[in-house]
């Protein structure tokens, strides 16, 4: 129990650039150049967890990430045709992995949703947003 309490208290401080790189690269967004971990935050409550971080990328890595998103087979330039509530899907527990790639006014976005495979367990929902105006990548992990 003490370990759990300590982990919860120090989780943000123990998060490294390598942890960030692994989470981003899980979605096939490769980071080749040096980058900075600008911000890292997590919050949790009973049954809910939210983790976000922001990376300052090189222009080259930013452009490669945008190209990866825009060249996806399911890329949508008009975000009105995307499922805005992907993480609240009625297929939270069972079903197939879904990835959405789309453009908003401010960012290029890749979302990943994987049902948990077990009734009552939160699915995996992760979002990567690449800024249109800055060399920034924002990662979000939402478990509800």
Annotated model-derived regions:
Residues 79-144:
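Extracytoplasmic electrostatic interaction patches
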Residues 2-77:
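N-terminal export/targeting and maturation segments
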């Amino acid at each position: 129990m003490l370990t759990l309490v300590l982990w919860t208290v120090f989780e943000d401080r123990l998060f490294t650039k390598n942890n960030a790189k692994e989470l981003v690269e899980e979605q096939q967004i490769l980071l080749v150049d040096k980058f900075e971990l600008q911000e890292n935050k997590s919050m949790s409550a009973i049954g809910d967890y939210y983790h976000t971080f922001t990376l300052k990328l090189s222009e080259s890595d930013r452009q490669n990430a945008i190209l990866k998103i825009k060249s996806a087979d399911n890329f949508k330039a008009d975000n009105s045709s995307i499922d805005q509530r992907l993480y609240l899907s009625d297929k939270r527990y069972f079903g197939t992995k879904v990835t959405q790639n789309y453009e908003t006014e401010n960012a290029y976005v890749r979302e990943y949703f994987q049902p948990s495979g077990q009734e009552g367990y939160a699915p995996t929902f992760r979002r990567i947003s690449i800024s249109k105006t800055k060399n920034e990548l924002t990662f979000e992990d939402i478990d509800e």
